[in-house]
From Swiss-Prot:
Protein name, UniProt field: DNA-directed RNA polymerase subunit beta''
Annotated GO biological process: DNA-templated transcription
EC category: transferase
Organism field: Fagopyrum esculentum subsp. ancestrale (Wild buckwheat)
UniProt keyword list: Chloroplast, DNA-directed RNA polymerase, Metal-binding, Nucleotidyltransferase, Plastid, Transcription, Transferase, Zinc
Length: 1365
């Protein structure tokens, strides 16, 4: 008894829980200390003890043991709330589909993980001896994931392809699944019997192919005599020390290791634990080890290249079938991991990013120059930092410094206040080159039918130049405008053109139909304020009241332009920015159009003028032409001050330069008729032919004048010009022949011309020419127009130093052609009003002035005036930031304190002929016809109204941006009023005076168009006052302000015609929130929006379809291409292993493998020359590929916790990389071009025949390698039996029966184990082949010396163990 006690005192007692890893270590130590037999006896006792304890405990699992986690309810509710917000953001067009998918995955994955983490503490606190808890953490077959599905939530599921299903299963198996959740679970969980068998058979088939390719690899020699090896370095730090030790143990050294002069390890010495510790202690830099890669045996392997046997720890025995062991070692974990995946149930596992949180409350400070704005993968705005960013959080008593690593997202702004534990940055996961990433295409389908529009330029995909596939160059929205195609069943000729607007009521009453190309727009009408808009549609059977005939479409880039048709129907339209008015005249207008006249005030958006700025312009009707032509300034060379250098632009204001102002008293206009026709037009006249008036030019066009025809063909269009005039064929002595391009005064020349003429030389052929004498129209420029003629004297009251002067200038350059469009008129000379002020001491510092229209209404009467204020540039402008008109809205006392202003008032004499009452909508002309010219502004009915007295402070409290308009309606209730050409500024003062400040919007500086407007009264009779000319209708931008006595102001969103609005935009305070759509009609009190749905798309996305194309529900709109990390599930891992071993895709083998191989081939061929370049290049290619393949396969298995020794992988990889392809017909008597042969065979054949064989390395998959072996019997038993046997018979192949399989098939003795002894001669076992005996061979000696003794010279990275893991 004492002896036993003494023995027990020396033993160490461990009171620890033994899990799987600890059990492995314990068994390993047992084998080292006691050997295999004694260890198996100990493990049998442990097994028996475990069975006895399990029987005694008798743990069973009941349904009541499944305890649901209490916090699950609010966690799921919170995730649903986030998903709802995410869906809203996607509906508004703020994030696109891929960002929504990513964020949804992370929301539910984080919820599921949180529940999983709560599970263990919940069990530990409530019931620590719960059988479910004990089983889940015992290390048995089940794991925490399965228990989590029982008591937590199943979460996101994968489909059979491994893609995530965007509908999480919120229930757990204890609560029970709904029908939808059950179907998703069955679909994605891969629990079917057939699918299970298929997945298991995949793993089994992989094992079969692996064994097939290496079944002949047997240890048959002791030493192959190679001096090659792979260098392993522990100092690189690229691999953990544990992996480094695992790689070394069991290997054999390929070279002696010295520490100084002392040899600490000899060549061919196997490495054990003691030697590894000694090498680490001495800090050896590089260790060269032998591997199956470097074995020189042709079809088997030697003991030293294989190393120790994994079973008993000594060198492997001769005759051991290491190939079959390797194939089973790689394939068997696949079957086990596949089964484990089935038990888990296909639950999707994502990854969450690492977040940086604020340590305390405070204000964020960082250097804004080191970051730039970007968009996160979830669509949130963020800053991206390229280098380490120091972020400071300043709280009241302490300053915290946080370092943000490079390539991270900063989620806060500078000077933002953050709270403790708030996420301030997101660290990107480290991108490894070995990560498996795949490009995924996600198609977005249309939810509704309508018309496709986009808000940016779109490029053609290069491979689909003529197709309907486009690429987006930048982030933008795709819009589907609501509408439905309406096909006509009645064969009637429609009066409606493409995209004309109509209303559904008219279609139902009149039973009219729209042509197939039209779309009925879906309208939503939003009324901002209380107003009674009455529609005046006529219901007569013969008349179409609210249609306008489309005369012609004018497209410009920046603005909407309108001009009238002859029957006074008005329509302006663009593809992207669309606008329509429905003015209609019941009776025909007078054919003689009155000369339109009027002054247009040109005030920029900010109301700011500099010296010599153009304040207003007036177009004299005498200088207006209806046809195209050329402007000539006479014989002297004169400049047009409309040129870029003559008229400079400063902040949207035109200014004159004095040196370009020239005196031109007379200019000439040479008229011509111009037609711009499409390239495909059929022209019925010839070039250089003479035609008469009303000649048919094309199928639809006739000439208005007669004369010479000139046709110019361009890329896409044909220009056809008709020159009127006389043709003169000059003689040799004719003076006219000497002149061309000149003007001839009347009475000169032989023909005695009555008027000025323009001589133009025409050369139809090289030898003949003639002269065309064209009539020229003379225009005299007089200085008779002055301020007194433009304005009555009582309108001008100049004050102080402000000066206004009248300047005339010609709009086109000398000799430049002027092309008219359709029925528009061309203005040749423009009279402008130039603003200036004196240069005295007081006004020397004044560089800018502010101008604004103001209309004051008192006692039910209106007066208009223009106010100009001079501003000193030394004092900063003190107006409100969003108030372009500036201090014009401030009181005099306030403005005087701010700045000494100088003002000029120009009063208008426009009077309303009768006061308006609240219910009287009859409108009379607003003109004073006794004057020669009219006032600045014409107002329509909706702008002329009477306001009742204010009731207390009611309006001050509501702060409505616009005063309600009583009973106002424009023509038909839907047209644009003229007042919409201006931004409104309304001022409510304590004196109850309404001041409306008009600021005209004018962004066009080159082209002006004539438009005519008509007013309508209650009796629906239309009459025409003097039309307004030269009003520019651009995309309307309305800015609403409301001010009262304490200068409170409010700004709402700007809105333009054709603009796309996202959902939930509010344009006025207390106004309705708009739906998404495109603005069609803008009024003072309402806006008409066509419903639309936005889809956000990122750069590089592919858009399907053309602009303006009809899209039906379910059509593909856009395709996203994004990178996605493949799931870590082994069901995705096994296909990856198979893909690598079958060499299906070079990209998945190594992302930069091709580049490295090409670089090596170039360098080696350049250094060694062409003959050796083939050999060495192939060698380098093979070594690079082998290391990359081993790393890839090991990464997959290590991610699943499976440890496979590198030697097994090396034997497999050695077989699939040991083939080369004969590339040239250099040795036609031995090998054929394109034949697959072994690398060693090619080298030995080349040495024997003393010729160079040109070959290149190829990677063959395991299936192809199994069909290209030395044994046709082995190939025939694997696949394609008939083909293999037929080819072997034709070639007369001989099978030497070296492998296992062919001997099994024929019933012979297999050459392994005891059967190996009779096949090997004793003399060959111990025969050594040292390197010195082969020095006579140039290739073997020199190449080995160069490559393996002078590695530093070549910097051969493939021999280092940087990536060898």
């Amino acid at each position: 008894m004492e002896v036993l006690m003494a023995k027990g005192a020396n033993l160490v007692f461990h009171n620890k829980v033994i899990d799987g890893i600890a059990m492995k270590r314990l068994i390993s130590r047992f084998i080292d200390h006691f050997g295999m037999a004694y260890t198996s006896h100990i493990l049998d006792q442990v097994k028996t003890l475990g069975f006895q304890q399990a029987t005694a405990t008798s743990i069973s699992l009941g349904i009541d043991d499944l305890l649901t986690i209490p916090s699950k309810g609010w966690l799921v509710q919170d995730a649903e709330q986030q998903s709802f917000i995410l869906e809203k953001q996607h509906h508004y067009g703020n994030i696109h589909a891929v960002e929504k998918l990513r964020q949804s995955i992370e929301i539910w994955y984080a919820t599921s993980e949180h529940l999983r983490q709560e599970m263990n503490p919940n069990f530990r606190m409530t019931d620590p001896y719960n059988p479910v808890h004990m089983m889940s953490f015992s290390g048995a077959r089940g794991n925490a994931s399965q228990v989590h599905q029982l008591v937590g939530m199943r979460g996101l599921m994968s489909d059979p392809q491994g893609q995530m299903i965007d509908l999480p299963i919120q229930s757990n198996l204890r609560e029970g699944l709904s029908l939808t959740e059950y179907i998703i679970s069955c679909y994605g969980a891969r629990k079917g019997v057939v699918d299970t068998a298929v997945r298991t058979s995949d793993a089994g088939y992989l094992t079969r192919r692996l064994v097939e390719v290496v079944q002949h690899v047997v240890v048959r020699r002791r030493d192959c005599g190679t001096t090659r090896g792979i260098s392993v370095s522990p100092q690189t730090g690229t691999i953990p020390e544990i992996l480094f030790i695992q790689t070394l143990i069991g290997r054999v050294l390929a070279d002696d290791i010295y520490k100084g002069p002392r040899c600490i390890a000899a060549r061919n010495q196997d490495i054990g634990v003691g030697l590894v510790n000694r090498l680490i202690t001495f800090r050896v830099q590089t260790i060269s080890i032998r591997t199956p890669f470097t074995c020189r045996s042709t079809s088997w392997i030697c003991r030293l290249c294989y190393g120790r046997s994994p079973t008993h720890g000594d060198l492997v025995e001769l005759g051991e079938a290491v190939g079959i062991i390797a194939g089973q070692s790689i394939g068997e974990p696949g079957t086990q991991l596949t089964l484990r995946t089935f038990h888990t149930g296909g639950v999707f596992t994502g990854g969450t990013a690492v977040h940086v949180r604020a340590p305390s409350n405070g204000k964020i400070k960082f250097n804004e120059d080191l970051v730039h704005p970007t968009r996160t993968r979830h669509g949130h705005p963020a800053f991206l930092c390229y280098i380490d960013l120091a972020v400071t959080i300043e709280s009241e008593d302490i300053i915290h410094n946080v370092n943000i690593p490079p390539k991270s997202f900063l989620l806060v702004q500078k000077d933002q206040y953050v709270e403790s534990e708030q996420v301030i940055a997101e660290i990107r996961a480290g991108t490894s080159t070995l990560n498996f990433k795949e490009k995924v295409r996600k198609h977005i389908y249309s939810d509704s039918q309508g018309e496709m529009h986009w808000s940016t330029d779109v490029d053609h995909a290069p491979e689909f130049t003529y197709g309907n596939v486009h690429l987006l160059p930048k982030t933008s929205h795709l819009w589907i405008l609501a509408g439905r195609p309406h096909k006509s069943r009645v064969a009637t000729r429609s009066l409606h053109k493409d995209q004309d607007q109509t209303n559904a009521h008219f279609l139902s009453v009149e039973q009219r139909y729209i042509s197939n190309s039209s779309v009925i727009n879906a309208y939503m009408r939003h009324t901002f304020f209380s107003s009674d808009l009455s529609s005046t549609n006529s219901n007569k059977g013969d008349s179409i009241s609210d249609y306008s005939e489309r005369k012609r479409i004018v497209r410009t880039r920046h603005s909407n332009l309108i001009y009238p048709a002859k029957n006074s129907y008005l329509l302006g339209k663009r593809r992207r920015n669309r606008f329509m008015t429905t003015f209609q005249s019941i009776q025909e207008l007078e054919k003689e159009l009155r000369a339109p006249s009027g002054i247009s005030i040109d005030i920029p958006l900010n109301g700011s003028f500099r010296r010599n700025s153009i304040l207003a312009y007036f177009d004299d009707p005498r200088y207006r032409r209806e046809s195209a032509g050329i402007t000539k300034y006479g014989t002297i060379e004169a400049h047009s001050i409309k040129k870029k250098e003559g008229l400079i632009e400063y902040r949207g204001v035109n200014e004159f330069r004095a040196k370009y102002q020239m005196q031109v008293d007379r200019f000439f206009f040479i008229p011509e008729e111009v037609h711009i026709l499409p390239r495909s037009s059929a022209i019925m006249v010839r070039n250089n032919s003479i035609i008469g008036v009303d000649t048919q030019i094309t199928l639809t066009t006739r000439s208005r004048v007669g004369g010479l025809v000139r046709v110019e063909k361009k890329k896409k269009k044909i220009g056809l010009k008709i020159f009127s005039g006389n043709i003169h064929f000059p003689g040799k002595t004719d003076k006219i022949s000497r002149h061309r391009g000149i003007l001839i005064p009347p009475g000169r020349g032989q023909t005695k011309l009555k008027n000025w003429s323009y001589v133009q030389r025409i050369t139809p052929t090289k030898k003949r020419y003639f002269v065309l004498i064209r009539p020229a129209i003379t225009y005299e420029i007089t200085d008779g127009i002055s301020l007194s003629t433009l304005f009555p004297q009582d309108l001008l009251q100049e004050r102080d130093k402000v000066q206004l002067r009248v300047v005339n200038y010609i709009l086109s350059g000398n000799g430049k052609p002027i092309r008219g469009i359709s029925d528009t008129s061309i203005q040749l000379v423009r009279t402008c009003l130039v603003l200036n002020w004196d240069h005295d001491k007081k006004s020397s510092s004044i560089e800018e002035s502010r101008a604004s229209f103001v209309e004051v209404k008192t006692n039910d009467m209106m007066r208009d005036f223009l106010r100009i204020d001079l501003v000193k540039s030394t004092i900063s402008y003190a107006g409100k930031r969003n108030d372009p008109s500036g201090s014009g809205l401030l009181s005099d006392n306030e403005s005087d304190r701010m700045n000494p202003f100088y003002s000029i008032y120009i009063y208008s004499k426009a009077r309303l002929q009768q006061p308006f009452s609240q219910n009287n909508e009859t409108v009379r002309t607003l003109l004073n016809r006794t004057k020669e010219f009219q006032s600045f502004i014409i107002l329509s009915s909706a702008n002329c109204f009477r306001m009742g007295p204010f009731k207390g402070l009611k309006y001050y409290k509501e702060l409505d941006p616009i005063i309600p308009i009583k009973n106002s309606s424009g023509p038909f209730g839907t047209s644009l009023q003229i007042a919409n050409f201006y931004s409104f500024y309304r001022l409510i003062t304590q004196d109850k005076i309404l001041v409306t400040n008009y600021l005209q919007l004018d962004n066009l500086k080159q082209t002006f168009w004539v438009m005519k407007y008509y007013f309508i009264d209650d009796n629906r009779k239309i009459y025409n006052p003097d039309p307004v000319s030269n009003i520019v209708l651009n995309s309307f931008k309305l800015n609403w302000y409301c001010l009262h006595h304490n200068y409170y102001e409010e700004t709402s969103a700007r809105m333009g015609l054709g603009q796309f609005l996202c959902e939930n935009v509010c344009l006025a305070k207390n106004g309705p929130r708009l739906k998404a759509g495109q603005v069609l009609i803008v009024q003072v009190d309402s806006v008409v929006i066509r419903a639309a749905k936005p889809y956000l798309a990122t750069p590089g996305a592919t858009v399907h379809g053309h602009y303006g194309e009809i899209i039906y529900e379910g059509d593909t709109l856009v395709t996203f291409i994004y990178e996605k990390s493949r799931s870590g599930d082994i069901t995705q891992g096994l296909p990856k292993v198979e893909q690598v071993l079958e060499v299906r895709s070079l990209e998945s083998i190594s992302m930069n493998l091709e580049r490295r191989i090409d670089a090596w081939n170039e360098r080696i061929t350049g250094i060694l020359g062409l003959p050796w370049g083939f050999v060495v290049g192939a060698e380098l290619t093979i070594v690079q590929s082998r290391i990359s393949l081993v790393n890839k396969i090991q990464k997959v298995y290590r991610s699943q916790g499976v440890q496979i020794h590198n030697r097994h992988l090396e034997i497999i990889v050695h077989q699939i990389t040991s083939k080369v392809l004969v590339s040239e017909d250099g040795m036609s008597n031995v090998f054929l071009p394109g034949e697959l042969i072994g690398l060693l065979r090619a080298e030995r054949t080349g040495r024997a025949l003393e010729e160079v064989i040109s070959y290149r390395a190829v990677l063959v998959g395991i299936t192809r390698a199994s069909l290209n072996t030395h044994s046709f019997i082995s190939e025939a038993s694997f696949q394609e039996t008939a083909r293999v046997l037929a080819k072997a018979a034709l070639r007369g192949r001989i099978d030497w029966l070296k492998g296992l399989k062919e001997n099994v098939v024929l019933g012979g003795k297999i050459p392994v184990g005891t059967g190996f002894k009779g096949l090997v001669h004793p003399s060959s076992q111990h025969k050594s082949i040292p390197l010195k005996n082969k020095k006579k061979n140039l290739f073997e000696g020199e190449i080995n010396d160069i490559l393996f003794y002078y590695r530093e010279f070549f910097n051969i990275e493939f021999l280092c163990f940087k990536n060898y893991q």
